[in-house]
Every structure is written in C-alpha cells, then in structure tokens.
Amino acid sequence: WSSDVCSSDLGVDYIEGGWPGANPTDSAFFDTPPRTRATFTAFGMTKRAGMSAENDDVLAAVLNANTPTVCLVGKTHDFHVDRALNISLAENTENIAVSFAHVVAQGREAICDAEHFFDGYASNPDYALEAIHAAHDAGARWIALCDTNGGTLPHDVHRITRAVIDSGIPGNRLGIHTHNDTENAVAASLAAV
C-alpha cells in the first residue's frame, strides 16, 4: 500500500510523521518523507520554561523537519502544568502563545494538540479555555481537543466542545483526539462533531 492511496481513499488531510529530534527513527523518517496528497506534519511540544522559542533546541528540531504543518502539544490541565511542568499557569499560557506565534512566523500552519483538555476542563474550565485561546490567538489554525486519558463520556465531550465554541473558537477550527481506554473513543469523537 502507499500512504498516498490510503490518505486519498480515506479522506485523510494530515499525516503526523512523529517527533523529529525525539529519537533517531523519527528524525530519519523526516529526511525522506513519504509523497502524499495529505499534508505531512511534524509533532512536538511547546517551548520549555526558561527558554525562548528561538533558542529551544527541541522546538527547533521540530521546525527543522521542514514540514508545512507543525503540531505542538500544549498542556491545558492545571494539574499537569503544576505537577509535570512545575510552572505557573500564567507561564504555561505564555509558553503556548509564544510557541505558536513562533511556528506561524516561520510560515508554517500550526495545530495545537490540547493535551488532557477534557480532564483540564473538568478541573478548571477557565484555565483550559485560556490555554487553547492562547494557541488560537497566536495563530494556530486548528485546536485538537484531547481526551488523553480516554475517560470522558460522550455526553461530556459534546457539552464541553459546545462550551469551547461558545467561548469564541470556531467549530470549523476544532479537531478531536480521543483515546479508547474506556471504549468510548468512537462515540466521543462522534459527540464532538
């Protein structure tokens, strides 16, 4: 099979090729990307605390893959910002905004993978919305709402997605990224759209 045939037949618009710089296999994959009608996309994370977007070597590796589209994961759950990143919510919001502005300034289409969004919204809806608005306002074309733990029920996915749209992010700029830990991924995806 070829990725071009599969992406065309399935209607896939984007193919995420991995995280350049994360390991030799992912990095090598970007040296000779597949030829496809779908938009080839590099994945990475927002800039790290204490660094500028211009001087973060992890973000630079993603941009150096020279893909037309870059997808960055941004933490949207206050618990993970506090415990995993060990930074303030304000600093995380700034990191998100600066990272997406940097990607867009490089002439790339930007996708925000809003990590743990549904759990974050359940914990602190104002902050979860603040985080995705930071990406959107900085130029991210797409905001992918992530059910990273796969535990959000479909009716909650629908309600929260509606709240995101009501907060000012257009529905035609949203994506859904579900995990199937509780066998709800398909139903949750349908509820989101």
Label the predicted regions.
Residues 1-7:
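Short, small-residue-biased leader/transition segments that mark boundaries at the very start
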Residues 9-12, 67, 107-108, 140:
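A structural motif
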Residues 12-37, 41-51, 72-87, 115-120, ...:
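Glycine-rich, proline-tolerant flexible connector loops at the mouths of alpha/beta enzymes
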Residues 23-48, 91-108, 112, 133, ...:
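Alpha-helix-loop-beta-strand connector modules within alpha/beta enzyme cores
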Residues 49-61, 85-98, 125-126:
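Glycine-rich anion/phosphate-binding loops
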Residues 52-62, 123, 127-131, 182-193:
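Catalytic cores of alpha/beta
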Residues 64, 69-111, 117-118:
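Hydrophobic alpha-helical hairpins/lids featuring a short glycine-rich hinge
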Residues 149-152, 161-193:
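Catalytic alpha/beta core domains of metabolic enzymes, predominantly
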